[in-house]
């Protein structure tokens, strides 16, 4: 069935009729074709030791109908210590194109047992690969680096790595000219004492000469209120603008965590928030999970708070919620739509 509109939160199949597996995903445009890539979670079910099955990519010319282009970063099955082994917690791949080197550069977060999180960096001549690993177990700035976004300045091509310093604050770091490492220069933002208050899952976009960051709180796969902030420069200072979903009474960002923001190249002022509904059957409000995580990470606690309810999830069945941003002055806002279309927006 050919789609002609978006249906947020509904099961989204590819052109072969299979459930799309591109979680924690982003879109990159290459030669007029859209490529949506993300974590392949098809085998990540409760009781499984499989966290991921590589990075899968899809292509489209209309953003509605997606052709499966396969695994652009396959799992490494025969080495449990390899960062791409299916048992490693591979999350949130991001790919940017380097005009100077002609390479596509992919960063992937890998979370080890405990709280240490590091990065693997790969490069390719084509968006579909093959990708060659150039960095493994990288600790940018000697920090434990969690959820992140990669940013290319639209004016000078300079690259930035925006990441959560785990359970602490948000970092904006300059990338090297080839985008495969950090230079050492960075700025810090939104310091918080502990989850669930720490901001994670940063999604950057640029509009009207301003830099925006959308972030979530830290409650695992359980959704919580998203927050927006704006700055005249990528290194800040950022002004917090408040809840991104002010009409959502559940305080769960419409049961979604945003992974990236896509600026449509052919539509005027259309920015699409790409989100994962990690837990389609979890319809509770966000306060219960928020309280559980706050207590679990409280100073002096040693992890003895019961968290089983918030640990056993089936991300193989996660859905997607794509919604357009609208702006009240400088403030981005997301409203719920059961269905929406690109035809609702003016052409450039």
Where are the regions that the model predicts?
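Carbohydrate-active catalytic/glycan-binding domains of CAZyme proteins
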Residues: 1-348
């Amino acid at each position: 069935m050919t789609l002609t509109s978006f249906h947020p939160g509904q099961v989204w199949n590819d052109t072969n009729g299979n459930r799309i597996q591109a979680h924690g995903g982003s879109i990159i445009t290459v030669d007029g074709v859209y490529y949506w890539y993300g974590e392949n979670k098809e085998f990540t079910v409760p009781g499984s030791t499989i966290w991921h099955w590589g990075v899968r990519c899809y292509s489209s010319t209309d953003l509605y109908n997606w052709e499966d282009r396969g695994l652009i970063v396959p799992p490494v099955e025969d080495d449990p210590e390899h960062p791409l082994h299916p048992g490693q917690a591979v999350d949130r791949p991001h790919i940017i194109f380097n005009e100077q080197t002609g390479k596509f550069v992919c960063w992937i977060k890998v979370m080890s047992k405990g709280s240490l999180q590091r990065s693997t960096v790969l490069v390719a001549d084509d968006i579909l690969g093959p990708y060659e690993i150039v960095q493994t177990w990288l600790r940018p700035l000697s920090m434990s680096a969690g959820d992140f976004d990669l940013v290319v300045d639209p004016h000078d091509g300079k690259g930035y790595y925006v990441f959560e310093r785990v359970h602490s604050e948000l970092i904006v770091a300059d990338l090297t000219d080839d985008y495969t490492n950090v230079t050492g220069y960075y700025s810090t933002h939104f310091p918080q004492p502990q989850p669930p208050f720490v901001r994670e899952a940063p999604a950057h976009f640029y509009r009207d000469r301003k830099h925006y960051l959308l972030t979530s709180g830290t409650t695992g796969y359980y959704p919580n209120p998203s927050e927006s902030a704006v700055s005249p420069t990528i290194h800040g200072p950022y002004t917090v603008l408040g809840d991104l979903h002010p009409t959502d009474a559940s305080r769960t960002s419409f049961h979604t965590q945003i992974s990236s923001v896509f600026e449509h190249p052919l539509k005027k002022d259309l920015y699409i928030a790409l989100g994962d509904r990690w837990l389609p059957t979890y319809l509770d409000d966000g306060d219960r999970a928020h309280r559980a995580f706050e207590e679990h990470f409280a100073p002096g606690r040693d992890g003895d708070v019961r968290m089983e309810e918030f640990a056993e999830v089936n991300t193989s069945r996660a859905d997607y919620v794509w919604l357009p941003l609208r702006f009240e002055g400088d403030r981005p806002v997301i409203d719920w739509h059961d269905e929406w279309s690109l035809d609702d927006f003016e052409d450039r």
